[in-house]
Regions:
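Short alpha-helical donor nucleotide-sugar binding micro-motif in glycosyltransferases
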Residues: 272-273, 280-285
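Conserved acidic donor-binding segment of nucleotide-sugar-dependent glycosyltransferases
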Residues: 325-326, 330-336, 344-350
């Protein structure tokens, strides 16, 4: 008989930071806890003190913040890796795969419980940014990819947010089973705003607003977007680019550029803003955009879609599975194409409204409250059916086929 209330371990180096991975982990943990299951979060520097479900439990593992602008925390809980006192756990859900992931693997083996891994951000793309000297050396070859494969291969199955992300992992020889399901967005993003009034606060009255909600990091290419917007502004004189989001390695460069005379009248940076303001900006913006060639999913696009705002983004990993080209927005292969698509939508109010309605309808499938219910089914399946096969050393092909058959009956999950 299946256990009615599960004790689920969430393992991540990111939880309280302001970025897509941290949001995905935090919102899912809260949504599962709201269903009555115990979620135990093992993460460094967790910010406590806010109202949360009684079944959401925080376990501090220690860490040092080495990049205050991004909130990146280096955590190496060596003293905990081989000593697990949490024998109540039923399953481990691992969200980051370096040292904390290794700890979770060791604990799971010691406890004899299954483990699932969500693969959001490839370490290969971020190590050089957050660990500047050693990281640059490590990313010159495929050492980091091989390390991730070594860890991920130990999981009962791997979860990714989009099909294009699965294709990327398969290109780097990650093994099946790999299942695709959105990380989901918080139900609060669907709030029906009766009053907005946000344009006055951010000096956007009478403007056609392109919103770029993102951390200011090189992989998000904010500088490229600012420069191409200068050309776009010539075609639409009342167009305005508003950047919002947490600080990152590109923050100072962005601030310097937008102070220049040729940009300051039609580009602004608001920094990290309160959630109510972000929600109102998603609602009032004419368009949102995201220009990144490697995304787990592109949650900021989904958040805007929940408020009925269409998007233009890079035709790349993650984003290409979120924007439905010609229906909820456009996918661009280069910046010139990006510029043309933005101009087209800003000039055509009817088309933009149609795309916005489509976007809001599509976004309904991404509510994290519904995604959490699917996760409970996956956890129970893994505990009761999949893990026993791995424990008894059944061949991988048998396990892959079992996963493929099971997810046929689940909403929003594909193989």
């Amino acid at each position: 008989m299946a256990k009615q209330v599960l004790d689920i371990g969430f393992f991540s180096t990111m939880y309280s930071q302001i970025n897509g991975t941290a949001h995905a982990v935090r919102f899912l943990s809260e949504a599962i806890a709201n269903l009555g299951h115990n979620v135990h979060v093992f993460a460094p520097r967790v910010q406590n003190g806010y109202k949360r479900p009684k079944t959401l439990h925080f376990h501090e593992i220690g860490g040092v913040m080495i990049a205050p602008k991004t909130g990146f925390v280096l955590s190496a809980p060596i003293h905990k890796i081989f000593f697990c006192q949490h024998d109540y756990l039923d399953i481990s859900h691992i969200h980051t795969h370096a040292v904390v992931g290794s700890m979770a693997v060791n604990w799971s083996k010691y406890l004899g419980i299954p483990m699932i891994g969500t693969h959001n951000s490839p370490m290969q793309y971020y190590t050089a940014q957050y660990v500047p000297i050693i990281g640059k050396l490590m990313t010159k070859g495929d050492l980091i990819w091989r390390y991730e494969r070594h860890i991920v291969d130990k999981y009962d199955f791997v979860h990714v947010a989009t099909k294009s992300k699965k294709d990327l992992l398969r290109d780097y020889r990650f093994k099946e089973p790999i299942v695709c399901m959105t990380n989901g967005i918080h139900d609060l993003y669907f709030t029906n705003l009766k009053e907005n009034g946000i344009r006055e606060k951010y000096n956007l009255e009478g403007k056609k607003v392109l919103l770029y909600a993102s951390r200011l990091s090189p992989e998000k290419h904010p500088i490229d977007i600012i420069k191409i917007f200068k050309e776009l502004h010539k075609a639409i004189p009342n167009a305005h680019l508003l950047l919002v989001g947490s600080d990152g390695p590109s923050t100072e460069q962005v601030k310097r550029i937008i102070k220049k005379k040729q940009y300051r009248d039609f580009v602004s940076y608001a920094g990290r803003i309160p959630f109510p303001d972000l929600l109102k900006l998603y609602d009032t913006a004419d368009l949102t955009c995201l220009w990144s060639w490697i995304e787990a999913e592109g949650l900021v696009l989904l958040e805007a879609m929940a408020q009925g705002t269409p998007s233009v983004g890079a035709n790349a990993c993650g984003i290409s599975n979120i924007i439905r080209h010609g229906e909820t927005g456009y996918l661009a292969n280069n910046l010139d194409q990006f510029k043309d698509y933005v101009i087209k939508l800003l000039k055509d109010d009817d088309l933009r409204a149609e795309f916005g309605k489509n976007a809001q309808k599509v976004a309904q499938d991404y509510r994290v409250s519904e995604i959490a219910k699917t996760w409970i089914k996956l956890y129970n399946f893994t505990i009761n059916e999949l893990y026993p096969l791995r424990y008894n050393r059944k061949d991988r092909k048998t396990r892959v086929e079992l996963v493929k058959e099971f997810i046929l009956h689940l909403p929003n999950v594909t193989f």
